[in-house]
Amino acid sequence: MAVTLPKPKLRNLYLPEQVNQESMNKLTKAIIEINEDDEYLKKLYAVHGIEYKPQPIQMYIDSYGGAVYQCFGLLGVMDKSETPIHTIVTGAAMSCGFMILISGHKRFGYSHSPPLY
């Protein structure tokens, strides 16, 4: 009898706005939930003799920055994330947006999306 194992959560996160308490809370919560889900799936897959390797979180950034202190909480969560986080600048990555961009485990950008510190 074949066992159907659950699939992981969606991994695309978006920051198309100013950095503020609300936007940082959304991203922080999403990263924590994905990490919790991946930890559960690793254990569940192991019970069935299958190795579970989580796919990276893709965080798309288009932000002119904003509240630095609220940003620090997200940066800490990103740093401790067991699931790799790939940050991609799609438009602007300025001020806090730049700090988020460089905190990704891997960093990417489109050719017409220069970051600004």
Where do the language-model regions lie?
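Terminal-region recognition feature
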Residues: 1-117
